[in-house]
Amino acid sequence: EVTLAPLPEYLSEGSRFTLEAGDEKGGLRSLRVSIEQAGRETTVVEKTFPYQGLFNSDGVHRHEAAFEIDPLVLNLAQGRAELKVELFDHSRRGGGDGNRTLFTHNLTVDTIPPAIRALTRLHYINQGGSCLVVYQTSSDTEKSGVLVDRMLFPGFSSGGKASPGSHVCYFAVPHDAAVKTPVLLWAEDRAGNETRTPFYHRV
């Protein structure tokens, strides 16, 4: 029995996982967590459990663990990967190696943030006023817009098939905002990678 959480679709940064493994009959013999990509397998967690007592009555029958997978630390490439949990019990079957339980989960490694840049050049904004910016995003962008301090003004696609990735955004600056209030273009992809970049404007 193996339970692993969470089960993300994407891996963009260091993520913490919790694992529960159990075998009520023979008890646990070994546990291994690994991530495989293009034939290259990297071990994340590996643990063995000794046979103790009559019929392993004093052995480990349930184990909980927490671990982190960081794609940068493990030098994972961009693209598909398979997260694997392999478990053996103390059964005499399988030539004495025990019964094997294999749990797998497919995910995509994506650590590259989306690209975004302004197409319009001059953006003059009065305090309490609004402005329009036209900008371009990369194809992996899911959400985008303008951040005025902590307020997000969402952008909308404007290019259609002729100019994919082109967006417009109407944004406003509060009347009591400081002259140096940060105004940034913002984009996020499916994996949760974010880009925040300045563009020419004057409040």
Where are these regions (language model features)?
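Proline-enriched interdomain boundary motifs that mark the N-terminal boundary
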Residues: 2-4, 113-119
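Contiguous beta-strand segments within globular domains
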Residues: 7-30, 64, 125-139
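Solvent-exposed loop/turn segments flanking beta-strands in beta-repeat/beta-sandwich domains
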Residues: 23-47, 138-150
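Short, solvent-exposed loop/turn segments at the edges of extracellular beta-sandwich modules
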Residues: 88-97, 188-193
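Aromatic sugar-binding surface patches on proteins
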Residues: 51-70, 161-170
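Flexible, low-complexity linkers/stalks enriched in Thr/Pro that connect modular domains
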Residues: 1, 103-112, 202-203
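Non-catalytic extracellular/periplasmic "stalk"
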Residues: 130, 137, 143-203
